[in-house]
Amino acid sequence: MNTVRVTFLLVFVLAVSLGQADKDENRMEMQEKTEQGRSYLDFAENLLLQKLEELEAKLLEEDSEESRNSRQKRCIGEGVPCDENDPRCCSGLVCLKPTLHGIWYKSYYCYKK
């Protein structure tokens, strides 16, 4: 019976001491993995940041193109009176003094070029 107790005690002591060593090794491995994981996360974060900056630059570029009056504002059609000093005739039209009809109105009209 004593030999069983001694054997059990010996196995218990060995298990505890080896378990402590394994625990320390596991802790070291976990620290290494977390450091590698952090470096991977930093890399992924930088990559995502670059992509977001590129996307933001494209969006700002599109906004600036729209703000440069790329679209034509409301314009005056053909045969409609216009202001000589501030003509707003549509593209392809010119603000001219009428030749025949409308002479009595003393106004300018949008005509084709």
Swiss-Prot record:
Domains: entry comment: The presence of a 'disulfide through disulfide knot' structurally defines this protein as a knottin.
Single GO cellular component term: extracellular region
Leader sequence segment: 1-21
Any matching Pfam family: Toxin_22
Family the entry assigns: Belongs to the neurotoxin 14 (magi-1) family. 01 (HNTX-16) subfamily.
Chief place where the protein resides: secreted
Localization in the cell: Secreted
Record keywords: Disulfide bond, Ion channel impairing toxin, Knottin, Secreted, Signal, Toxin
Pro-piece positions: 22-74
Region called Disordered, residue ranges: 61-83
Name of the protein described by the UniProt record: U11-theraphotoxin-Hhn1a
Disulphide linkage map: C75-C90, C82-C95, C89-C110
Residue ranges crossing the lipid bilayer per the database entry: none
Domain of life: Eukaryota
Its job: Probable ion channel inhibitor.
Molecular functions (GO terms): sodium channel inhibitor activity; toxin activity
Tissue specificity as recorded in UniProt: Expressed by the venom gland.
Taxonomic placement: Eukaryota, Metazoa, Ecdysozoa, Arthropoda, Chelicerata
